[in-house]
From Swiss-Prot:
Gene3D superfamilies: 3.40.1350.10. InterPro entries: Restrct_endonuc-II-like, tRNA_endonuc-like_dom_sf, UPF0102_YraN-like. It holds the Pfam family UPF0102. This is UPF0102 protein NE0719. It comes from Nitrosomonas europaea (strain ATCC 19718 / CIP 103999 / KCTC 2705 / NBRC 14298). Belongs to the UPF0102 family. GO terms for molecular function: nucleic acid binding.
Length: 118
């Protein structure tokens, strides 16, 4: 049986592969700074895409989407700003979510613009 950390890593690998099939380019995995962590940082054309990956084996507590709380969104936004500050240029960006339902043979749902900075 996989540990929670291994399942999370497997989900991130699955999400990265899925997004690469959709023609996004992987820039970084598990970007960390003092504000938090971003699972995947991708690029689609000229847009930097910050991706939160969620895997849930059941929908009992609202499923994967419900686990991206306002507090989590705030941490992701601060972390993304930190990432962008370290890179020259003015890049458009967005926040996506990839939701993987482990109880349905890794059914993948990609939510573009899952939330914004406001």
């Amino acid at each position: 049986m996989s540990s929670a950390g291994n399942k999370g890593s497997d989900a991130e690998q699955c999400a990265a592969a899925f997004l690469q099939q959709q023609k996004l380019t992987l820039l970084e995995k598990n970007y960390r700074c003092r504000f938090g962590e971003i699972d995947l940082i991708m690029r689609e054309d000229d847009t930097v895409v910050f991706v939160e990956v969620r895997m849930r084996s059941s929908d009992r507590f609202g499923g994967a989407a419900a686990s991206i709380t306002a507090a989590k969104q705030s941490r992701l936004i601060r972390t993304a700003r930190h990432y962008l500050a370290g890179h020259e240029g003015d890049f458009p960006c967005r926040f996506d979510a990839v939701l993987i339902s482990g109880n349905r043979e890794n059914e993948i749902e990609w939510i573009r613009n899952a939330f914004d900075e406001s």
